[in-house]
């Protein structure tokens, strides 16, 4: 099993969720996060002049899937979240040793 973590633009969350659902993936976790990449935030122009925003609002999408589903999940998230601009985000793949369904105590791949 693998956990796919994607940090994406807030406005791309709905299209990503809909894309995952179209592909048959319904279980996910969403977390509002803030961060920055190589660009170190961004500089905006206001009435009082330029000002810097160090941390940008993003959304983290987490999906735990079987190893053979990872490529499809990555493709779907990338396809629905890509704008081609700086700040589109990142996707991370993390090994998952095991999983437990709290309600039943069931362990392993059947929990996902």
Indicate residue ranges for each PLM-predicted region.
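Positively charged, small/polar-rich N-terminal and surface patches that mediate targeting and assembly
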Residues: 1-112
């Amino acid at each position: 099993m693998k956990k796919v973590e994607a940090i994406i633009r807030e406005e791309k969350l709905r299209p990503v969720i809909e894309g995952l659902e179209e592909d048959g993936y319904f279980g996910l976790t969403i977390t509002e996060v803030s961060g920055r990449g190589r660009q170190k935030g961004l500089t905006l122009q206001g009435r009082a002049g330029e000002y810097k925003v160090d941390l940008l609002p993003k959304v983290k999408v987490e999906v735990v899937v079987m190893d053979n589903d990872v490529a499809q999940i990555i493709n779907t998230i990338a396809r629905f979240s890509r704008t081609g601009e700086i700040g589109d985000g990142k996707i991370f793949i993390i090994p998952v040793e095991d999983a437990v369904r709290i309600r039943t105590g069931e362990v392993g791949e059947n929990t996902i």
